[in-house]
Swiss-Prot record:
Physiological role: Catalyzes methyl transfer from S-methylmethionine (SMM) to adenosyl-L-homocysteine (AdoMet). SMM degradation (by HMT-1, HMT-2, HMT-3 and HMT-4) and biosynthesis (by MMT1) constitute the SMM cycle in plants, which is probably required to achieve short term control of AdoMet level.
Name of the featured protein: Homocysteine S-methyltransferase 2
Residues in Hcy-binding domain copies: 12-326
Domain of life the protein comes from: Eukaryota
Reaction(s) this enzyme catalyzes, per UniProt: S-methyl-L-methionine + L-homocysteine = 2 L-methionine + H(+)
């Protein structure tokens, strides 16, 4: 089931939420799941490396999440930038084509998923959406600054706008349902995104998701409430929330977000494991199990979250458990029939 966007960004997101019965399930970790399927991501391009080496694996992971119950799959473009591809020797045109390819792969996965279920006489009755991921400047640097928000001398709004502008345009032109501004580490980059959405006249609903280091501030130390207010004032932002943050912080963060916005709230935490930015590896035995992760879900729903999924180190099993939990929720609306 494909539900098109119309009206304001917030209205579009609310319509998708309603069509799903009151909650939308996001997918889980992409890069870590690609590694689990045999991909070597030891590269500054991270998951975007698979756009070059193994696009079939990206498609497989998208399909795995759809089969697990995800309503939204997020493209393999979080760390894909024109500048990053050019540093690997690609032309600007080739770099833009790779960005487009990230969206095309997700759209293909959706088409395959819907077709397979139609052929099995089990047509999908909920929205299936593609969100084009746009990671921060820090994600491009691949030096851990996406987890600190400290960009040094590069940290000016005009620099960040110039860095992201063409990338945003290319991703939007590829035809996703949403633009996902993910793991936003500082207030300045949020302001840059808002101005770009207006200047580029992007008419695809966007979401802003920040990451928090302590349950109060985003990772730069900027106030989450101030950052949420920036998103709230932008009509092109349809939802706002948190990603890549330990589950234990989410309850308080949702309550903070609700103080300053009525937009739909999205939550997709990581597994709770700690990432060592210098060693570029996850520290073992610092996270929670799928069962513990999912135990938070009903609380987050009561707090006001309506889009829920997982980030780094979560898997299709995590998303399957979230899907089952939400479908058992007493607040779950009856799914509408497809006309």
């Amino acid at each position: 089931m494909v539900v098109t966007a119309a009206g304001s960004a917030e209205e579009a997101v609310r319509r998708w939420v309603d069509a799903a019965g009151g909650r939308l399930v996001l997918d889980g970790g992409l890069a870590t799941e690609l590694e689990a399927n045999g991909a070597d991501l030891n590269d500054p391009l991270w998951s975007a490396k698979c756009l070059l080496s193994s696009p079939h694996l990206i498609r497989k992971v998208h399909m795995d999440y759809l089969e697990a119950g995800a309503n939204i799959i997020i493209t393999a473009s979080y760390q894909a930038t024109i500048q990053g591809f050019e540093s690997k020797g690609f032309s600007k045109e080739q770099s833009e084509n790779l960005l487009t390819k990230s969206v095309e792969i997700a759209l293909e996965a959706r088409e395959m998923f819907l077709k397979e279920h139609l052929e099995k006489s089990t047509p999908i009755q909920h929205p299936v959406l593609v969100a084009a991921s746009l990671g921060s400047y820090g994600a491009y640097l691949a030096d851990g600054s996406e987890y600190s928000g400290d960009y040094g001398e590069a940290g000016t709004k005009e620099f960040l706008k110039d860095f992201h502008r063409r990338r945003l345009q290319v991703l939007a032109e590829a035809g996703p349902d949403l633009i996902a501004f993910e793991t936003i580490p500082n207030k300045l980059e949020a302001e840059a995104y808002v101005e770009l959405l207006e200047e580029c006249n992007i008419n695809i609903p966007a979401w802003f998701s920040f990451n928090s280091k302590d349950g109060v501030h985003i990772v730069s130390g900027d106030s989450l409430i101030e950052c949420t207010t920036i998103a709230d004032k932008c009509a092109k932002v349809g939802a706002v929330g948190i990603n890549c943050t330990p589950p234990r912080f989410i309850h308080g963060l949702i309550l903070s977000i609700r103080k300053v916005t009525d937009k739909p709230i999205l939550i997709y935490p990581n597994s709770g494991e700690r990432y060592d930015g210098e060693k570029k590896e996850w520290v073992e035995s610092t996270g929670v199990s799928d069962g513990d992760f999912v135990s938070y879900v009903n609380e987050w729903c009561k707090d006001g979250a309506v889009l829920i999924g997982g980030c780094c180190r979560t898997t299709p099993n995590t998303i399957r458990a979230i899907h089952r939990t939400l479908n058992k929720s007493p607040n779950k609306q009856q799914l509408p029939a497809v006309e």
